[in-house]
Amino acid sequence: MSRRHKAEKREINPDPKFGDLVVTKFMNAIMLDGKKSVAENIVYGAFDAVQGKSKQEPLSVFHSALDNIAPHVEVRSRRVGGATYQVPVDVRPERRQALAIRWLIAAARKRNETTMIDRLSGELLDASNNRGSAVKKREDTHKMADANRAFSHYRW
């Protein structure tokens, strides 16, 4: 880690359809090999599919899904006198959002539907209803932190 300069945060533009920065971050995370237009088609197609399946506003479904996936606490490894403890720590808001996006995409990629649009829309709907493997990942993270609450005094 550099001691001289802190890396500057890059300015990102909101997406053209909804004007939302979180959707842009989501698109950038979906994108593979710099193919932004493909990522846009996937995200907007999934949003259209969500609207078709649930008759709800896709942006509100997306934000509620992210809120249901985002972890509040996680465990970090801390070495104390030859033993490594899993210490529960609170998650910063930026990291909460990043983890939620990452877990949502990973869960969507693991699903069995044929196209990524179907997988993503299904996972978004499941997550907004507190179901699905991304929400399970959040629950597992919280259980791990709860099980290691005894080591919370090793926080830094």
UniProtKB/Swiss-Prot annotation:
Source organism of the structure: Rhizobium etli (strain ATCC 51251 / DSM 11541 / JCM 21823 / NBRC 15573 / CFN 42)
Subunit comment: Part of the 30S ribosomal subunit. Contacts proteins S9 and S11.
Keyword Repressor: no
PANTHER family: RIBOSOMAL PROTEIN S7
The protein's role, per its UniProt record: One of the primary rRNA binding proteins, it binds directly to 16S rRNA where it nucleates assembly of the head domain of the 30S subunit. Is located at the subunit interface close to the decoding center, probably blocks exit of the E-site tRNA.
Family: Belongs to the universal ribosomal protein uS7 family.
Annotated keywords: Ribonucleoprotein, Ribosomal protein, RNA-binding, rRNA-binding, tRNA-binding
InterPro entries: Ribosomal_uS7 (IPR000235), Ribosomal_uS7_bac/org-type (IPR005717), Ribosomal_uS7_CS (IPR020606), Ribosomal_uS7_dom (IPR023798), Ribosomal_uS7_dom_sf (IPR036823)
This protein's GO CC annotations: small ribosomal subunit
MF terms in GO: rRNA binding; structural constituent of ribosome; tRNA binding
Protein name as annotated: Small ribosomal subunit protein uS7
